[in-house]
Amino acid sequence: MMIRHALLSLFLLVLAAPAAAQSMRTGGEPARPGFGTAIAITGGQVLVAEPNGVRSPGAVYVYGEQAGSWVEVARLGAESPAAGDLFGASIAASGDRLIAGAQEGETGGVAYVFDGEGDEWRRVARLSASDAVPSDSFGTAVAIAGDVALVGAGGADSSRGAVYVFRRDGAGNWSQVGRIAAPAGMLPDDRFGEVLAVQGETAVVAATRADSGRGAVYLYSGEAWQQAARIAPDSLTANARFGSAIGIADGLVLVGAPGFNGFRGAVYAYGTEAGSWTELGSVPFEGTPQERFGSSIDVAGEVAWIGAPGADRFAGAIYSLGPGTSGPFGAEPVKLTLIDSLPQGGAFGVSLALGENVAAVGIPGEDYGMGSAAIFDRAGDAWTLANRVESEAGSGLAAMTGEPQTCDGQVGAFSCSNVDLVAFLPVASIGGDRGVRLNDIWGWTDPETGKEYALVGRVDGTSFVDISDPANPVYVGDLPKTATSPGSTWRDIKVYQDHAFIVADGAGEHGMQVFDLTRLRDRENAPVTFTVDAHYTRIQSAHNIVINEDSGFAYTVGNSGGSETCGGGLHMIDIHDPLNPTFAGCFSDPSTGRQKTGYTHDAQCVMYRGPDEEYAGREICFGSNETALSIADVTDKQNPVALSMAEYPNVGYTHQAWLSEDQHYLYMDDELDELNGLVDHTRTLVWDVSDLDDPVLVKEFLNPNTTSIDHNLYVKGDKVYQSNYTSGLRVLDIADPVEPEEVGFFDTVPFGDESPRFDGSWSNYPYFESGVIIVTSGYEGLFLLRYREADRPIS
C-alpha cells in the first residue's frame, strides 16, 4: 500500500502553532527530527521515516510483526548517509519496493529505490534529475507503482516545479524516461510536483501553492504521461492548499485541502465518466477551525482514512470514510477513537498508511518534535493499538566530567581554540526527557556559601546545576513549566535578590515564575522537583525578561497572548519585593518593530553612567526591536520617553545587544542577516552610543572564521562572549572597541557544518568570579568552559 504524501510544510505549521529569550518567534526553532513524518505499508511491514534525526542522518525504520508485537527489523539510509540529508522526507511503497527522497549537498536532491525480501532490504538505485541544479528540491515527493517511479522537484524552473519519470528495465536498471514540466501558466513558487500519487497508468500531481495557495491538481495517463485533466473546485479559498494529500484507488481519487475554510479542511472525490475526470462531490465535514482535515489520505478497498492533525488543539485525529448512498466514499466521515490519550501538539494524522489488516499513523510532533508512530491491527471491523514506536533520543554525546580538558585544537568531538572544556552534561543528565532541548541560561552565586549555580532553560522547565566544583557539576533539581502551558522553544531567566524570574514565549498563560534560589541549599534528595514561590499573571507569554538589578525593576518583552502586552514592548514590573511583583507601566516605540507596535525582542536596562552627561543617573533601556535599535528613558515608569531609534544596512532581525562596561559602545547581533544571505560572514554591529539621542553605527564586524547565525552575546571586560548557534561559543577581543577580533572559540555542535541555521549554542553566562563560562547548546547540553588569554587573534 502506498503512502499518500502529506505536505511537510503544513506539518511544520502545525507544530509551530501551539508553541513562541532569545530566539525570534518567527523562525528561531531548530529543525525537528519528525519521526513519523512519512509512513508506508508494504508486504506486511510498516515503514516509518525520520528525515532529520538529532545529529544523525535521515532514516527509514522497517517494522515487522513478531510474536504479536511490532519490532524493528531493518533500518534504511542514503548511500553516503550524513546529518541533514533529509533521507525519508518523502517515501512511497509498492509491492516489495520502496522509494525515498533525500537531499545531498548541492545535488538538488536524489531518490533511492530499495527492494525488499522478508526482513532484508537492498538499495538498488540512486535516482537524480538529468538536468539537476541545487535549488530543484528533487525528491521532496515520490510515488511508485511496480516498475515506474515519479519524483517531484518543486524547486525546479524557479519553483514552478517539475516531475521526473523513471522506469526499471528487464535487467533491473532504473533510468529517467521522461520529465513532466509544469503546465502553462504555472508561476514561480507554485511548486508543481510537491505531492504525487500513481496507480497503474494514472499519475496525480499537485501544485498546492498555485492560485494564491488555493492549489490545483493535474492528472496524467498513458505511457507518455499526457495531461488528462486539471481539477480544482470553484469553492476553494485562498490558502486552501488543495492537493496537499492524495489518495488513489481503482479509478477514484480523493484530494485533501487542509487549509480550506479557516483550516477546517476539506476532501474532494473525483472519478471518470465517459473517459473524463469529474468531481463526484466533497466529503461532508463540518469540523472546527484548525482541524486541517485532509492533511493525509490513504485508501484500502472501500475505506479511506483521512488525517486531521489540528483536531483537539493539535493532538490530531483520524476519520474513516466508506461508501454511501451517493457512491464510493459518500458516507459521513466517522472520527475514530484509536488511542485513549494523545499529546497536545503531537499532530496525530500528519501522515498515515492503511492496509487491509494493519494501519500506521504518524505522531511527528510528540516529544517536542522527536515524533513517534502508532501501529494498529485489525480484527473484524475493529482496529486496536498494537504498538507505539519511536527512534532513540539524545545526541549520542556522553557526559565529560572529572578532569578539565585543555583545548589543543580539539577536545573529544569538539573543535576549539583557546577555550578549555571544564565539564559537559548532556540534556538527559539535567532533567531533559526525549525531545527536550536547552535554550536560555543565567547564573547565580549564593551569597552565603559562595557556590555558583547554572540556571538552565529547557523546553519544559528550568534545571538548576551546582557548579561549585566545576569539573564535577551536580544536577540539583527541576522547576517545571507552568502546569497548563505547552512546552516552549523560548524560555528566559534572570536573577534579582537571590530569586529567579522565568518567562516563556508561545506558552499560553505561562506568566512569570518566581523561584527562591536559596532553596537550592537544601538538596538531600537531589534532584528535587520544585514548585514556584510566586506567579505573576499580568502577562501570559513573553519572549524575554530583562532585569536592572540596580533599580529593582524587571521588564518582560515580546509579550503576547493576552493580559497587558504593552504592544510587545517593555512591560515594567516592580520586583523590589521579589515575591510580590507589581505592574509599573508600559513603554513601546511605534516607529520600530515589524508591525510598528514597538515590539521589543530583547533589551538591556541600566542606571546610566556613560559619557552622555545629560542622562547621568537616569534609567535607560537599549531595545533590540526587530527592525532597529531603540533607546528609551524609563526612569518615570508612568511617563517613559523614547530618546532615539537607529536603523542599519541589511537588517534581517534586530535580535539582542549588550553595552561595553563604560557604556560607550553597544554590541548587537542580527538573527537573520546570515540566514537570509544579507551578509556572507557572521556580523556583529558596533554602535557608538555616547550620544543617546543620536546613536551611530561605527563598525560592522564580519567574522572571517564563521558564517553561522549570531544569537546571544554578553560583554565582560574587554571580551565579547557570543553564542553563535552552529559555531558554538565565540570570544571577541574588544580592547580596541571598534575593531573586534576573534581570539577563541568552542564549537558545541560536533555534527555537520556551520551553515546558518537555528541549531546549537543558544546562550552563555560569563560573569562568575571563578571564570567558568556556562553555555547551552540545544540538543547537546550544558558546557562549562574557560577562556585562556590568547597571544594573537584567530585567523
Provide a role label for each language-model segment:
Residues M1-L7:
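Bacterial N-terminal signal peptides that target proteins for export
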Residues A16-P18:
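N-terminal signal peptide c-region/cleavage motif recognized by signal peptidases
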